[in-house]
Amino acid sequence: MRRPRLLLLLTAVLWGHVGLASAETDEPRRNVFDDPFQQLTRGQPNCPVPPGPMLTEADAKAQAHGRIERGTSCYRAGRCRLPNSYLYDKEIMPRVQKAVDADGRFGSTTSVWALGQRRWIWLQGCVGSEAESTALESLVRGIDDVEGVVNELKVVP
């Protein structure tokens, strides 16, 4: 049980370091790996847009090998029906949007973006309370094919 939590922590730390290293350069950024990234709610107009999957070429090269290994490991282990876990992301993201819209609790008080990578969903943006943050994470975690959720939401009352 401790391994998934350790993996989650290490992944979050890695992404934080990659983002910080990239923030210091003026290199052009793009969504090199075509990871789905979309705004789910728009209730806090002053919430800044998160960087999402925008990478420099150097960042993309640094991540490429690890993405290949992580992408195919779930299929080799028999946990995925598709040969690469990144193939799920474009199927999952519409379900995330649909679940948030159908729930109805978050539209007027949050501005949230979702980033999908290898069956994991990163929630980024602003919520009105810790309870909203927890409820949104729980909602997304319950969606089919979602393996994990990284909650990077900031509480902005």
Language-model region placement:
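N-terminal targeting leaders
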Residues: 2-157
